[in-house]
Amino acid sequence: MSWIERIKSNITPTRKASIPEGVWTKCDSCGQVLYRAELERNLEVCPKCDHHMRMSARNRLHSLLDEGSLVELGSELEPKDVLKFRDSKKYKDRLASAQKETGEKDALVVMKGTLHGMPVVAAAFEFAFMGGSMGSVVGARFVRAVEQALEDNCPLICFSASGGARMQEALMSLMQMAKTSAALAKMQERGLPYISVLTDPTMGGVSASFAMLGDLNIAEPKALIGFAGPRVIEQTVREKLPPGFQRSEFLIEKGAIDMIVRRPEMRLKLASILAKLMNLPAPNPDAPREGVVVPPAPGQESEA
């Protein structure tokens, strides 16, 4: 028996450990392998490169509003395939698939609650539901959010993440642009704040309507914001676009948005802004939401 065979005979193979699916994930930006539970505590922000990953509508609203204060609005509204639309797949089949995948009936979730004790109405897009596209139910739920804010005499916050109008609903989808914008005019008449938070991506008919009509338009870092996408624009104008075109950092340089706020700092920032606008006491910055870790941006860690 050769020396290699003698060594091999003394080696006992170890049993391969089985790791449950979904425990680990990878950052789309830097490629870092991340522990899923830690990433959720960091509000889907990569602790290595500060990349803001896409966040579900419900997780976003639950991380924003005070625990125990959330009441969902418009959950009874469901999309209908009135046009019997079909492209490569029937619209009703696309809806059923999206509903099964996300657990949502449509792409916008609306809740009322409190933010640091202040009554607010908040809406958030579920991008995983047909790209967060805006159809008649999205428009109806947004109007319901406006009506609730008017009834409660409180601010409205909307987190947009959408590819634009839903082509399967044709004109009924495009009509939501005017419908939602008209509803916001009532907020302005009443003097109630409407804050629009633009997340990645905010495009098409959503960016061309209520997403850019906030009293303050706030964006998350490196969010893609615009009407047509960069590739479509380059093909149309036949020119190379400047670096960072349509990203939030590019837009704030051009004065198209008001500020960029990191997601872990968003809750306190929104509460502070709304407290000033509503003439209410400033929120306590030393009272972080239970269970939520506020990681510093890379390069800004404390020296402790």
From Swiss-Prot:
PROSITE patterns: COA_CT_NTER. It holds the Pfam family Zn_ribbon_ACC. Acetyl-CoA carboxylase is a heterohexamer composed of biotin carboxyl carrier protein (AccB), biotin carboxylase (AccC) and two subunits each of ACCase subunit alpha (AccA) and ACCase subunit beta (AccD). Component of the acetyl coenzyme A carboxylase (ACC) complex. Biotin carboxylase (BC) catalyzes the carboxylation of biotin on its carrier protein (BCCP) and then the CO(2) group is transferred by the transcarboxylase to acetyl-CoA to form malonyl-CoA. Residues 23-292 form the CoA carboxyltransferase N-terminal domain. It is found in: Cytoplasm. Its EC number is 2.1.3.15. Its main location: cytoplasm. GO terms for cellular component: acetate CoA-transferase complex. Residues 284-304 are annotated as: Disordered. It comes from the Bacteria. Pathway: Lipid metabolism; malonyl-CoA biosynthesis; malonyl-CoA from acetyl-CoA: step 1/1. Belongs to the AccD/PCCB family. Its cofactor is Zn(2+). It is an enzyme of class 2 (transferase). It comes from Salmonella arizonae (strain ATCC BAA-731 / CDC346-86 / RSK2980). A zinc finger (C4-type) spans 27-49. The gene is accD. Binds 1 zinc ion per subunit. This is Acetyl-coenzyme A carboxylase carboxyl transferase subunit beta. Coiled coil: none annotated. One of its GO terms (biological process) is malonyl-CoA biosynthetic process. SUPFAM superfamilies: ClpP/crotonase. It catalyses: N(6)-carboxybiotinyl-L-lysyl-[protein] + acetyl-CoA = N(6)-biotinyl-L-lysyl-[protein] + malonyl-CoA. PANTHER family: ACETYL-COENZYME A CARBOXYLASE CARBOXYL TRANSFERASE SUBUNIT BETA, CHLOROPLASTIC. Keywords: ATP-binding, Cytoplasm, Fatty acid biosynthesis, Fatty acid metabolism, Lipid biosynthesis, Lipid metabolism, Metal-binding, Nucleotide-binding, Transferase, Zinc, Zinc-finger. GO terms for molecular function: acetyl-CoA carboxylase activity; ATP binding; carboxyl- or carbamoyltransferase activity; zinc ion binding. Zn(2+) binds at C27, C30, C46, C49.
